[in-house]
Amino acid sequence: MRILFCSNYFTHHQIPLSDALYELTNHNYCFVAHKEMDAERKNLGWGNDLVRPYTCSMADQEVQKQLNNLDVLIAGSFPERQTKEYGKKAKLFFRYSERILKTGNSLLKYPKRFFHWHACNPPWRKAYMLCASAYTAGDYAKFGLFRGRCYKWGYFPETIRYPSIDDLIDRKAKATILWCGRFLDWKHPDDVIEVAKRLRDAGCCFKIEMIGTGEMEQQLKRQASDAGLLETNI
């Protein structure tokens, strides 16, 4: 099976699904980006570590290779003229979109888009929607589009299996509690010592950090030391 995914540019959002399709199709998968990623996103780190063997530009020969006997086309933000050209060669056609009613549910703001979307997705074209948002299907349904023809985006979270949950808990860092204030009687910093005693007696793994200065500082250190908390928990 040959799959061609076309969009404006390749981002980390598409990596897990693209990696899976690349392997499932025995490397007959290609992602086509039609423009360079803008500087703002690059500065945010979007372009880092995005080199993949299946990514290419519209001018690459790999695209023409994929178009020969193309089975599936997935089209996101891509020039419509090219999308139609590629779509004619595909046996199965998917649109790829986030939600379209991001500023509310008023349809009166979108009359031009209504006609544009219907022109790009006529009822006689058997097209499907690959939803990049939980709201995509509902938004397009309000315009009478892709009803009953929407599919969820593919997620591939890593599953880590540990031989022992108890060992994992033992390796976890201690929970940290921060108390910050002046060490004064009416601030009741000594209550922190009492809390620490209760947590220790309950078998909790924790560390308390106290930040501040004041007349009770030495008293608090003595209380923590007498309770056996100074070196271990506070």
Tell me the role of every PLM-derived stretch.
Residues M1-N48, Q64, N68-L70:
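N-terminal subdomain of nucleotide-sugar transferases
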Residues R2-F5, D60-R81, F94-R95:
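Short N-terminal targeting/anchoring amphipathic segment
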Residues A33-M37, C180-L184, K207-L220:
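Glycosyltransferase donor-sugar binding loop
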Residues L101-N121, T159-R161:
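Nucleotide-sugar donor phosphate/pyrophosphate-binding loop at the beta->alpha transition
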Residues W124-K172, T176:
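Donor nucleotide-sugar binding/catalytic pocket of nucleotide-sugar-dependent glycosyltransferases
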Residues Q218-I234:
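Nucleotide-activated donor-binding/catalytic signature segment of Leloir-type glycosyltransferases, i.e.
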